[in-house]
Amino acid sequence: MNSSTRIFALLGRAVDYSYSPLIHNTAFQALGLPYHYTIFNIAEAALVGDALRGARALGLGGFSVTIPYKQTVVPFLDELSEEATTIQAVNCIVNKNGKLIGYNTDILGFASPLFAYREALHGATIALFGSGGAALAAIEAFQRYFTPKQVLLFARDSQKAKSQLRSSLALERYTNLAIVPLSDYERVRECRLVINATPLGTKGRADGSAIIPLESNLLHSEHIVYDMVYNPTITPLLQAAQAVGASTIFGIEMLIGQAEQAFTLWTGEKMPTELVRQTVMAKLQEL
């Protein structure tokens, strides 16, 4: 890295565990691009605006945005893409000649591994846990790409979740969305697809290992279980799903899917996706 190297970074809080630097630096090096990707941990939301103003002044190339700032960054950007405007959440920022443009590549990144199940999801009920930026992307993905009967959004505080969603979404668009209390988790049994859009299950976290009590035998072989957590590769939720013969989707698929689009937005090049996947999987297997 030298003075002519263009810098890209992940904006988040306590995200040193992230594999985004490995993904993007592998791709930059493979294509011979003079770019470097790093992590910027921002301690509190009040500092996000300062960070983005500094990035503009320093000429940084762009950012990935993760927990908990996907919505926090929105007011500080100069422009939003259509899909980011729709859900008022951003996970990718491009610095285009001093103009910071926000995108949401989570929507298609989330949807991509589900396209193989499109027929199975037609007319189905879906269980979605989480109410942050990742959950917003999932809700919008179902609106754009799939035809479920109903999406059940499980929330610890239903009223708070509804208020949060209303601040980001035009809720009248989502006629099949129902917000239900977390205490109704037994309804998971009736769902075809179960999604974890929370950090629960992430390696090193002390706040629980799964979105539902795994000893409750709610999962069955007809389920498709999608965990957005990617470290560990096989989370406690996915382990429980595999044990009963359910189909599983690993979080690494969404991670790489959204990163692939961000890479193209930053560089105009196509990411060498298979090389990236092999590199990340090899790293995860070392742990």
Swiss-Prot record:
One of its GO terms (cellular component) is cytosol. Pathway: Metabolic intermediate biosynthesis; chorismate biosynthesis; chorismate from D-erythrose 4-phosphate and phosphoenolpyruvate: step 4/7. Shikimate binds at residues 18-20, 66, 91, 106, 230. It comes from the Bacteria. The keyword rRNA processing does not apply. NADP(+) binds at residues 82, 130-134, 228, 251. It is an enzyme of class 1 (oxidoreductase). The active site is at 70 (proton acceptor). GO terms for biological process: amino acid biosynthetic process; aromatic amino acid family biosynthetic process; chorismate biosynthetic process; shikimate metabolic process. It catalyses: shikimate + NADP(+) = 3-dehydroshikimate + NADPH + H(+). The keyword Translocase does not apply. Keywords: Amino-acid biosynthesis, Aromatic amino acid biosynthesis, NADP, Oxidoreductase. GO terms for molecular function: NADP binding; shikimate 3-dehydrogenase (NADP+) activity. Its EC number is 1.1.1.25. CDD domains: NAD_bind_Shikimate_DH (cd01065). Coiled coil: none annotated. Involved in the biosynthesis of the chorismate, which leads to the biosynthesis of aromatic amino acids. Catalyzes the reversible NADPH linked reduction of 3-dehydroshikimate (DHSA) to yield shikimate (SA). PANTHER family: BIFUNCTIONAL 3-DEHYDROQUINATE DEHYDRATASE_SHIKIMATE DEHYDROGENASE, CHLOROPLASTIC, SHIKIMATE DEHYDROGENASE. Belongs to the shikimate dehydrogenase family. Homodimer. This is Shikimate dehydrogenase (NADP(+)). The gene is aroE.
